[in-house]
Amino acid sequence: MRLSEESIKYILDLQKNMLPLIYCCANNERLGILEDTIKHYNGIFSYKDSKLSKEEYPINTLLIFLDEMNSESILDIEKALIAMNKRERVLLEANGIDSLINKRNLALSIINRYDINVIKGTKSEIETLIKFQENVEEEKLNESNVNYKYRNFSKKNNTILIIKEDNYYITDGYSEFFIKGNNNYFLNKNELDDIYT
């Protein structure tokens, strides 16, 4: 069977449309690391100063990293979030929100105003988010049912939580599972972390 030139062009255009275009709001060091991982999985990578045309390549995934935010980056995040559709994915990595009040307030503002599909952080960062969003004392929950608060937060915000400690804990509010990432059985820890992002 021979394919016509139009058929081949149609297939290539369809494939280009299905590949994820990921827009990252992060510092330059993080951008370099993520670009390699995203391109390895055939994704297209974009950031504020990239030369990609947003009309030709519509963004379908937004990655937000709160580790080095300034007022200009916050404005870029707001613009990108407003432009996102419901079917597009937004990932928020909650770096440093357990220690800095302005990042905590920014993260809560983003979570409360926009649909965030995935929130990733350490145990203390996620617990800080839960504590300040619910504005309740956490001693009501005993340690034996500690995952209940994660599932409840995930269900309430309609998001997937990825909690990064020795093991990865992932929940969508209804189900939960652990991935042991502390051994180098199949990947090194940095590559595993980038894949979850």
What spans do the regions from the language model cover?
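N-terminal loops that bind phosphate or other acidic moieties
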Residues: 2-20, 27-34, 38-40, 108-109, ...
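Conserved beta-alpha-beta core of the PfkB/ribokinase-like small-molecule kinase fold
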Residues: 61-63, 69-145
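Conserved phosphate-donor
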Residues: 144-188
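Conserved N-terminal subdomain of the carbohydrate kinase-like
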Residues: 2-90
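Short, small-residue alpha-helix embedded
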Residues: 128, 188-197
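Structural alpha-helical scaffold elements that stabilize or flank donor/cofactor-binding regions
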Residues: 55-56, 110-112, 153
